[in-house]
A protein has these predicted regions:
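Short cysteine-rich clusters marking metal-coordination/redox-active sites
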Residues: 118-121, 144-147
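Short, flexible, mixed-charge glycine/proline-rich loop motifs
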Residues: 101-117, 125, 134-139
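Transmembrane alpha-helical hairpins and terminal membrane-anchor modules
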Residues: 139-145, 153
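N-terminal alpha-helical interaction blocks
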Residues: 1-108
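Long, charge-rich boundary regions
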Residues: 148-207
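N-terminal pre-domain and mature-chain start segments
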Residues: 90, 94, 105-109, 113, ...
Length: 207
């Protein structure tokens, strides 16, 4: 069972799983099985499960939990980013909260997010390779150059930077580029990593 199935399980229109007993191990999981598996996955990968469930609007509580997990991670790694590490306690905490909140929102974006769908590939992540299409005489596709194959645009990091600048008025462009941006990007990447960990654990406990 993969995390995608968790989203389907919570959809009222999904007929995929029920509370009826399974005839064989290969049959669809029952509702009880799914809830038990989710509980096990949450105990081992709480960050990833919260991030995924929050992203898919399964729980508002999970959204806040995911941001809290991300803030903990940010505090843990902030020492690697000099411009952030040297901030005073209260200011540093507020900056990390801002970065974690915006980074999680970036992670949550998809082609279904209003205004985020790539205008070149219309959310498919694929585009026509004109040169090869002309060369081969048939349609040849390639990764969309605008969205890099994901089908949507990332949240503009400038919004996070503006919020940080309100907390650190004297933040310079070099400091932002060398410390704030790398930390922000690391937080977004961590969300995807934690989701992948949760996905693997959920798959393992439902085999």
């Amino acid at each position: 069972m993969r995390l995608e199935s968790v989203a389907k399980f919570h959809s009222p229109k999904s007929p995929m799983m029920s509370d009826s007993p399974r005839a064989t191990a290969s049959d669809s999981l029952s509702g009880t099985d799914v809830m038990a598996a989710m509980g096990m996955a949450q105990s081992q990968a709480g960050f990833g499960m919260a991030a995924f469930c929050g992203k898919h609007e399964l729980s508002q509580n999970d959204k806040q939990k995911a941001i809290n997990y991300l803030m903990q991670f940010a505090h843990k790694v902030s020492g690697k980013y000099r411009g952030v590490a040297k901030l005073e306690g209260n200011t540093k905490a507020k900056v990390l909260q801002v970065l974690a909140t915006f980074a999680y929102a970036d992670y949550c974006r998809s082609a279904a997010t209003p205004g985020a769908r790539c205008r070149d590939c219309h959310g498919t992540g694929r585009a026509v390779d004109i040169a090869k299409t002309e060369q081969w005489g048939r349609v040849v596709e390639k990764e969309c150059g605008r969205c890099k194959g994901v089908g949507y645009s990332r949240m503009p990091a400038s919004a996070a930077y503006r919020a940080v600048t309100m907390l650190i008025p004297n933040l310079t462009q070099p400091t932002r580029s060398r410390t704030v941006k790398p930390l922000y990007d690391a937080l977004v990447v961590q969300c995807h990593k934690e989701e992948s960990i949760a996905d693997n654990i959920l798959n393992a406990v439902t085999r």
